[in-house]
């Protein structure tokens, strides 16, 4: 909802030396050819050390400084949560998603700049954000050109009136807010991954740009469900999908996880802080849980949660969200057509 009200969507010498020494220590410890332990649709992700963030030519400012992180072992869903799985949750609990509820203006205005006028009642309705391709080239900094706030849109009706998830039960569920994913996680007795867990899992234990390696997404056979062609008006459909794809349609990463790039953005548990990585500039992060509070200098009144992995809309011209280190954020009460989630479980230490 807030995305519609406002227009969206150096490492110093000492820290650089610290990073170099850490990398030299762990670069030869890439996790390769591990046996894939799978249980109840989840893959065991081993503990490991890696360099979180990026400094390459496509990296955004919030991806730096690159810093060393250790993550304990955990279980992670092999795929994104599907419509079939989410329907089981709805049938069992009667839960009503954010997109199916009318926004509460009194709560909404607390996270907007002071004196923001109340929007027209036509906006204060049960709705979600839907992608609409444009007729031609547009300003890629103006996300509102291709995102439309529409009523009667939800996980059941991903494109609104006349659409359905019939014959798409193996597609990732979408129009899911962060709060919705939390409700599902509680029911499933799992949790959302931390941002660090997510990036380690996406890397597959190897130091590569993408979950599949370093080859550009546009080279060779399709590697993920992303936007091929000219965004947001011409998709060549090289990967055969305009919107979501059935989970597992592309090759898994070295850990055996599917769709860690493209298809849908995935919620993480962390608040989004634009400057969060700076707190690890000269020290290792040990199972970081994210910042205590959100911070975005460009949207200072908005409380946002981290999303990872990119979506079917990602294209190098403006997004490249399918890079392992790429970060995105959104309001936790906002549903979007390109956003879903997957869950994790902690591995309990054996009793002594």
Across the structure, where does each feature detected by a protein language model lie?
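Bacterial Sec-dependent N-terminal signal peptides
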Residues: 1-32
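Functional-site microenvironments in short loops/helix caps that host divalent-cation chemistry
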Residues: 30-32, 44-45, 51, 55-56, ...
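GGW-centered surface loops in extracellular recognition modules
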Residues: 36-44
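C-terminal, low-complexity/hydrophilic appendages and adjacent surface loops
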Residues: 59-64
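A short N-terminal beta-strand-loop micro-motif at the entrance of redox/enzyme domains
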Residues: 67-74
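Short capping motifs at secondary-structure boundaries
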Residues: 74, 89-98, 188
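Short, solvent-exposed alpha-helical surface patches in non-cytosolic proteins
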Residues: 78-79, 83-90, 177-183, 199
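Short beta-strand-to-coil "C-cap" segments at the C-terminal boundary of structured domains/repeats
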Residues: 343-350
């Amino acid at each position: 909802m807030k995305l519609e009200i406002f227009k969206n969507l150096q490492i110093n010498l000492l820290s650089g030396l610290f990073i170099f020494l850490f990398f030299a220590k762990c670069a030869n410890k890439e996790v390769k050819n591990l046996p894939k332990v799978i249980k109840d649709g989840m893959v065991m992700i081993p503990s490991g050390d890696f360099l979180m963030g990026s400094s390459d030519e496509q990296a955004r400012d919030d991806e730096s400084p690159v810093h060393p992180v250790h993550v304990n072992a955990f279980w992670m869903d092999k795929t994104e949560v599907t419509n079939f799985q989410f329907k089981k949750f709805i049938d069992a609990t009667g839960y009503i998603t954010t997109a199916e509820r009318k926004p509460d203006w009194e709560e909404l205005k607390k996270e907007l700049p002071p004196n923001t006028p109340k929007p027209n009642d036509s906006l204060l309705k049960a709705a979600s954000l839907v992608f609409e391709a444009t007729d031609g080239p547009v300003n890629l900094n103006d996300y509102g050109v291709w995102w439309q706030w529409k009523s009667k849109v939800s996980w059941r009706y991903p494109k609104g009136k006349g659409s359905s998830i019939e014959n798409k039960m193996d597609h990732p569920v979408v129009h899911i807010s962060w709060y919705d994913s939390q409700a599902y996680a509680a029911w499933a007795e799992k949790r959302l991954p931390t941002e660090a867990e997510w990036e380690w899992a996406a890397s597959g234990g190897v130091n590569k740009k993408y979950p599949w390696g370093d080859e550009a997404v546009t080279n060779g056979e399709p590697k993920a469900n992303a936007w091929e062609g000219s965004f947001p008006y011409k998709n060549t459909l090289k990967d055969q999908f305009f919107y979501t794809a059935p989970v597992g349609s592309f090759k898994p990463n070295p850990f055996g996880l599917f769709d860690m790039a493209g298809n849908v953005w995935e919620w993480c548990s962390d608040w989004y802080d634009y400057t969060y990585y700076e707190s690890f500039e000269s020290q290792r992060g040990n199972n970081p849980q994210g910042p205590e509070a959100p911070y975005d200098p460009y949207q200072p009144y908005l409380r946002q949660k981290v999303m990872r992995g990119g979506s079917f809309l990602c294209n190098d011209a403006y997004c490249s969200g399918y890079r392992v280190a790429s970060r995105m954020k959104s309001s936790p009460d906002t549903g979007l057509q390109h956003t879903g989630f997957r869950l994790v479980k902690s591995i309990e230490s054996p009793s002594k």
